[in-house]
């Protein structure tokens, strides 16, 4: 039941809900949309890094090289490899005695 369709009224036996007809198509549609929204919010919080990384970079691992001459492709690969090699130099080996 949606909170927007419920009304609590005091009766002799205590509190009871007088809800609108739950077979109303609008209530059913709103309930389904609410449940789907809740599921998507939970999945978004659990997997936001994976989801947004996929959206940002797509399924490919790097920029497209379609239409680029082979010499430029090789130059790009060398630049990428040298950048990785430079990053490897930041690690420090610590020996415990």
Curated annotation (Swiss-Prot):
Keywords: Disulfide bond, Host cell membrane, Host membrane, Host-virus interaction, Hydrogen ion transport, Inhibition of host autophagy by virus, Ion channel, Ion transport, Lipoprotein, Membrane, Palmitate, Phosphoprotein, Signal-anchor, Transmembrane, Transmembrane helix, Transport, Viral ion channel, Virion. When the channel is activated, one or more imidazole moieties of His-37 probably become bi-protonated. It is found in: Virion membrane; Host apical cell membrane. The modification Phosphoserine is found at residues 64, 82. Residues 1-22 are virion surface. Homotetramer; composed of two disulfide-linked dimers held together by non-covalent interactions. May interact with matrix protein 1. Residues 44-97 are intravirion. One of its GO terms (molecular function) is proton transmembrane transporter activity. InterPro entries: Flu_M2. A lipid is attached at residue 50 (S-palmitoyl cysteine). Forms a proton-selective ion channel that is necessary for the efficient release of the viral genome during virus entry. After attaching to the cell surface, the virion enters the cell by endocytosis. Acidification of the endosome triggers M2 ion channel activity. The lineage of its organism: Viruses, Riboviria, Orthornavirae, Negarnaviricota, Polyploviricotina. Cytoplasmic tail plays an important role in virion assembly and morphogenesis. It comes from the Viruses. Its main location: virion. This is Matrix protein 2. Belongs to the influenza viruses matrix protein M2 family. It is a single-pass type III membrane protein. GO terms for biological process: protein complex oligomerization; symbiont genome entry into host cell via pore formation in plasma membrane; symbiont-mediated suppression of host autophagy. The M2 protein from most influenza A strains is inhibited by amantadine and rimantadine, resulting in viral uncoating incapacity. Emergence of amantadine-resistant variants is usually rapid.
